[in-house]
């Protein structure tokens, strides 16, 4: 007898919003398996049918989802908490993710269409799937005998793309604001605000410089959005998430950055 798919969902608190006076769609990435691609297409179809945007793929979300699908298969459970007591957001950030909002769908079943239909039929899962804040997703799957374990992760990239690069003397943080509500980018190093040395309000492009002395400090990146309110979109320790080194020609392109050093 054909088993109905088993499903689980988790939706975290949606946004961290701080008052400034207080301290502290893309193509699917290469290497994605065909079943995961099918799930992505099915979920995007459900969103489009309800007037929502399609989700782009996020390679880091995909890696996190695949790793957790393998973990769930090994443990023989469907749980939103891993053996280290971490939920989806913590697992994503442990792999270098910086966004502050991650949702998760879990399921098991051999037929991707049946699993997607089960998520749609469940009010809690549908709430996660149809969240209008999502911009990207990542799907992981792991075969377990006659069935398959599925993990779908969602996140909201309000700053995309975002790069955190090592430079001589510090770190270059650059990206593009994607939010229509954004008035200007904001970076807080510990409790100290850092001004952008580049900011183009027309395109949303910005750059910040973080000195080497502050590489181990907790940073909050986001944007100011009316009534002196800061919406935090990304959090990170520069020393833990920095990617490749940036060329020196890019690292010293402004007097402001030289002053930061």
Regions found by a protein language model. Give the residues of each.
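Bacterial N-terminal signal peptides that target proteins for export
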Residues: 1-11
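Bacterial N-terminal signal peptides
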Residues: 10-22
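Compositionally biased, intrinsically disordered low-complexity regions enriched in proline and serine
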Residues: 3, 19-20, 219, 224
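Functional surface patches built around histidine and acidic residues
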Residues: 25-261
